[in-house]
Amino acid sequence: MIKVGIAGIGFMGWMHYLAYRERDDIQVTALCTRNQAKLDGDWTSIQGNFGPPGEQVDTSAMSKYQEVEALLANPELDVIDVCLPPHLHKSVCLAALEAGKHVFCEKPLALNDEDCDALVAAAEGAGLQLLVGHVLPFMPEFEFLYKAVQQGTYGKLLGGRFERVISDPLWLKDFYDMEKVGGPLIDLHVHDAHL
C-alpha cells in the first residue's frame, strides 16, 4: 500500500484525493492545510470550473497538519502530493525530497527552468521519483497528436500554434500574478508545451 500525504486541500488537492480514492493500492493517510474545517473533513467549500464540487470527507483516520514541515516528518508517508500554489512548489518539493519522500507535484513543477532543473537533480541525487501532474497526454486527442508528430504522419513538425478556449480557473485567485502563479502561460500553456 502506497501511503500519500496531500499538501494543499484546495481544488486540485480535491481532484487528486478523488483519484486516490478510486485506487486499491494507494491510501491518503495525511493532510496538510491551514484550514481547520478542511482538516475536520468539511471540503464543501471547494469548487472549480470542472469536476465535482467538494463534499464531506472522513478524515478521522488521517494524520492532520497545518505546517508542511510536520507533514514531511511523518515517517509512514511514501509520497507527498504537492497541491499548493505554484510559488511554493520548489521549496516544498525540495523539502519533501530531502525528507526522503517521493513527490507528485501538481503542474507547474516550478515557475522557471532553473528551479525545475534543481528539483530534477535533487530527485535523481536522492534516488527518488518526482512526477508532475500533466494530465493532457492521457487524453485521446493529445495521444493522437503525439503519435502523429512522433511518426511523422503529416511530415516534419516545423512549428505549432496553441489556442486554449477555457475560462480562468475559479480556484486560483492569483491566476494572473506572475510571481505566484506565472500567469496563463505557465499555469495552462505548460500542458501544451509539455507535449
Language-model features: where?
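Conserved G/P- and acidic residue-centered "switch" motifs that form tight phosphate/ATP-binding loops
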Residues: G8, K107, G152
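Rossmann-like NAD(P)(H) cofactor-binding subdomain of soluble oxidoreductases
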Residues: L88, P108-A110, L131-F138
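Rossmann-fold NAD(P)-binding glycine/threonine-rich loop
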Residues: L109-Q129
